[in-house]
C-alpha cells in the first residue's frame, strides 16, 4: 500500500509573489494544499499608537506608508475624519485636486496589480507595459506634489499645493492615451486562452461569504454585490460625476480581474469629468489654525480605496493629538479569506489566488 506524507512548506517571508514581507505556511499532500496559515506582522510599525503622540498634520506622512501603492486615498481618509469633526468646508478647487489625485492613484495602483499579477503567473511583457503607463501617472503626481510614492499632499482643509501651470492639460492628454493602452491590454491578455485557463473557476467564493469575511472593493464586487462608497455613500464631490460600478457574478479570479480592469476605465471617466469641471481659480486650503485641535468627541469616516473600504476612527479630547486613532485597513480584512480559498487547491493556483486578492503588506500590518 502506498503511503503519502504531508509536507510543511514556507512561502516567504521574502518571496517575489508576495510584494512585501509576508509568510504563508502551507501544508501540502503531493500538489494539493491541505491547510494555509498566513503569518503577518513583519511590517508592523505601530502607526496607530505613534499617532497618539503626533499632531494631526504630522500623522499624514504615516498614512502614506500603509498602502504605499495608493497613498493619496490614505492621506484623504485621515484629513476627512478631522474635517468631519471640525465641520470644515473644503474649497472647490481643493476638492477637484483631491479627486484627480486619488483617481490617478487608483489607476496607478491597478496598473501595478495588473503587471505584477501577470508576471507572477508567467507573463513578462504586461509587467513592462503596466509600469510604462504607471510612470506617466507618477510623473504627473510628482509635478503636483513633489513626490513619487509617499506624497504627503493632503492637508486638513484642502491640499498643500495648487496644480502647476499646464498640469490639468497634461492630465487631459493622458486620458485618451490610457484608454488606447487599456484596449491593448485586453487584446494582449484578457482573451488569451492560457491566461483564461489560469483564472476562470479559480478561487471562487459567494457573496454571502464575502460579506461574512468583511471583504470590500473588487473582492466584494466580484461576487455580484454592487457596493462602492463613491456611489453608495458619496464623499468629497463624487456625486457630481457620472460613472458605473463594475460587478462580477461568479466570484472567481477572472471576475476580480475584470472588475479591476473596468475600474481603470471608470476612473478615467471621473478624471475626464473632473478636468472639464475644474474651477479656473480659487483657494486650495480652507482657513484653519496653524495647530489643529479637533473638538472633543469622536468620528468615523470611510472611503473607497483601490483595495476596498478604508476607514478612520478618531476619538478626541480636544487636544492637538488624537486620544485614540484607528484605521480600518481593507487589505487586512481581505486577507482573512485566503486560507479558505487555498484549502483543497492545487499549489500551482496559490499565486493566482494570492495575486487576485491584491493585498499590500504595509496596510495589512499597520
Swiss-Prot record:
SUPFAM superfamilies listed in its UniProt record: HydB/Nqo4-like
Covalent S-S links between cysteines: none
Membrane topology: Peripheral membrane protein
Xref: Gene3D superfamilies: Cytochrome-c3 Hydrogenase, chain B (1.10.645.10)
Main localization (coarse): membrane
GO annotation, cellular component aspect: plasma membrane
Superkingdom in the source lineage: Bacteria
Keyword Amino-acid biosynthesis among UniProt keywords: no
GO molecular function, one term: NADH:ubiquinone reductase (non-electrogenic) activity
Localization in the cell: Cell membrane
Signal peptide span: none
Entry EC no(s): 7.1.1.-
InterPro entries in UniProt: NADH_Q_OxRdtase_suD (IPR001135), NDH1_su_D/H (IPR022885), NiFe-Hase_large (IPR029014)
Entry keyword set: Cell membrane, Membrane, NAD, Quinone, Translocase, Transport
Reaction(s) catalysed by this chain's protein: a quinone + NADH + 5 H(+)(in) = a quinol + NAD(+) + 4 H(+)(out)
Pfam families: Complex1_49kDa (PF00346)
Assembly notes: NDH-1 is composed of 14 different subunits. Subunits NuoB, C, D, E, F, and G constitute the peripheral sector of the complex.
Task performed by this protein: NDH-1 shuttles electrons from NADH, via FMN and iron-sulfur (Fe-S) centers, to quinones in the respiratory chain. The immediate electron acceptor for the enzyme in this species is believed to be a menaquinone. Couples the redox reaction to proton translocation (for every two electrons transferred, four hydrogen ions are translocated across the cytoplasmic membrane), and thus conserves the redox energy in a proton gradient.
UniProt record similarity statement: Belongs to the complex I 49 kDa subunit family.
UniProt name for this protein: NADH-quinone oxidoreductase subunit D
Source organism: Bacillus cereus (strain ATCC 14579 / DSM 31 / CCUG 7414 / JCM 2152 / NBRC 15305 / NCIMB 9373 / NCTC 2599 / NRRL B-3711)
Amino acid at each position: 500500500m502506498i503511503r503519502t506524507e504531508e509536507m510543511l512548506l514556507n512561502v516567504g517571508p521574502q518571496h517575489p509573489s508576495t510584494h512585501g514581507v509576508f509568510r504563508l505556511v502551507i501544508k501540502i499532500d503531493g500538489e494539493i494544499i491541505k491547510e494555509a496559515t498566513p503569518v503577518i506582522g513583519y511590517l508592523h510599525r505601530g502607526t496607530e499608537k505613534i499617532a497618539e503622540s503626533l499632531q494631526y498634520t504630522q500623522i499624514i506622512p504615516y498614512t502614506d506608508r500603509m498602502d504605499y501603492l495608493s497613498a493619496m486615498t490614505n492621506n484623504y481618509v485621515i484629513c476627512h475624519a478631522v474635517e468631519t469633526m471640525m465641520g470644515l468646508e473644503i474649497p472647490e478647487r481643493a476638492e477637484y485636486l483631491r479627486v484627480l489625485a486619488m483617481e490617478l492613484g487608483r489607476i496607478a495602483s491597478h496598473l501595478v496589480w495588473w503587471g505584477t499579477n501577470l508576471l507572477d503567473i508567467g507573463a513578462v511583457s504586461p509587467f513592462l507595459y503596466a509600469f510604462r503607463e504607471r510612470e506617466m501617472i507618477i510623473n504627473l503626481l510628482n509635478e503636483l506634489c513633489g513626490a513619487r510614492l509617499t506624497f504627503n499632499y493632503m492637508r486638513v482643509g484642502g491640499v498643500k499645493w495648487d496644480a502647476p501651470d499646464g498640469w490639468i492639460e497634461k492630465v487631459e492628454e493622458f486620458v485618451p492615451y490610457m484608454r488606447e493602452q487599456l484596449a491593448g491590454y485586453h487584446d494582449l491578455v484578457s482573451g488569451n486562452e492560457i491566461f483564461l485557463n489560469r483564472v476562470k473557476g479559480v478561487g471562487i467564493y459567494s457573496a454571502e461569504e464575502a460579506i461574512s469575511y468583511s471583504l470590500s472593493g473588487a473582492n466584494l464586487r466580484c461576487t455580484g454585490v454592487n457596493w462602492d462608497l463613491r456611489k453608495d455613500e458619496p464623499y468629497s464631490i463624487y456625486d457630481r460625476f457620472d460613472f458605473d460600478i463594475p460587478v462580477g457574478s461568479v466570484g472567481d479570479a477572472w471576475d476580480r480581474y475584470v472588475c479591476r480592469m473596468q475600474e481603470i476605465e471608470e476612473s478615467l471617466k471621473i478624471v475626464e469629468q473632473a478636468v472639464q469641471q475644474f474651477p479656473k481659480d480659487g483657494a486650495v486650503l480652507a482657513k484653519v489654525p496653524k495647530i489643529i485641535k479637533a473638538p472633543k468627541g469622536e468620528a468615523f469616516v470611510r472611503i473607497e480605496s483601490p483595495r476596498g473600504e478604508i476607514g478612520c476612527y478618531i476619538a478626541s479630547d480636544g487636544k492637538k493629538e488624537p486620544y485614540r486613532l484607528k484605521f480600518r485597513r481593507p487589505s487586512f480584512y481581505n486577507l482573512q479569506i485566503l486560507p479558505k480559498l487555498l484549502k483543497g487547491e492545487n499549489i500551482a493556483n496559490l499565486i493566482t489566488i494570492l495575486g487576485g486578492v491584491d493585498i499590500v503588506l504595509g496596510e495589512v500590518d499597520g
